[in-house]
Amino acid sequence: MLRSILFYPGVILSLIISPIALIRIKYLEIRGKDKERTNAIFKITHSWAKYVMWLSGAKINVHGRENIIRDEAVLFVSNHQSYFDIPLIMSTIDVPQGFIAKKELEKWPIISMWMKYIHCVFMDRENIRKSAEAIVQGIQILKSGYSMFIFPEGTRSKGKSTASFKAGSFKLALKSKVKIIPVTINGSYKLLDANGGKIKASDVEVCIHEPIDVTKLSKEEISELHSTVRDIIVSKLPKDQQ
C-alpha cells in the first residue's frame, strides 16, 4: 500500500513538470539540429522511464544487451504482460525507439505528447483500415532509420499464457527490410496487474534475443515468421505462460 501511495503521486508530478524539458527540444528544433533533438528526447524519456521503474520497486535483470543493434533501425518484438512494459523497455533498451501502441493511449494527457515525440504510432485494432494505416506509418518510420517496438499479441497476458502473434505485425520488418530482435518480458505483471491496481515490488527479467535478418528468409520461413518469433520469446517464460 505504501508503495502505491508514493508511486502514483510521483508519476503524476513527474508528468506535470516534464513539459519544462520542451524548452530545450524546441530550441533544437528552431536551430535545425535534428540529431541533437532526437538524442535529447531519448535522454529525457529514458530517464523518466528509469524513474518510473525505480518508483515501482522493480528489480530488473537484463540478459542479451550485446544483441542490441545501435547503428541501424530494427523492429523489436515482445510478449506483453503489463502496463509497465513500455516504461520497462524504455528504461532497459537504451536506443531511441517508438512503439506501436493502442489508440486509447493517445487520449492520455502529457503521456501521449511524449509518445508522439518518440515516434509512437497509435493503432485501432478494431478497425482493419486504420490498423493497416498504422502499419504503413510504422514502416515509414523504420525506413527513415528509427527503430520501432511492437507487442504482436495485441493485448496484455497479465501472467497467463502468451497469445498467438498477429502475422500482420511482421509486415513492419518485411516491408522495411529491417532486422527483428525478439524480446522476452518475464514478471512485469507482478508489479501491478496481479495486484488489483496496487503497486508491488517484484523481480522482472528482460531477455534480448539474437537478431533475425528477414532478408535471408525463405518464403516458407516468412510465412511462419510470427510463430517462429513467438517460440523464441516464450522459450524464456515459465511453462504455464507459454
Language model features by range: what are they?
Residues 44-50:
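N-terminal nucleotide/polyanion-binding subdomain common to many enzyme families
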Residues 50-60:
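Transmembrane alpha-helices and immediately adjacent membrane-cytoplasm interface residues
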Residues 22-34, 38-43, 54-56, 70-128:
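Catalytic core of membrane glycerolipid acyltransferases/transacylases, capturing the structured
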Residues 49, 120-124, 154-155:
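Short, basic, glycine/proline-bearing loop/turn elements
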Residues 132-242:
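Non-catalytic C-terminal accessory region of glycerolipid acyltransferases
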Residues 1-30, 39-43, 60, 66-69, ...:
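Membrane-interfacial terminal anchoring regions of lipid-handling membrane enzymes
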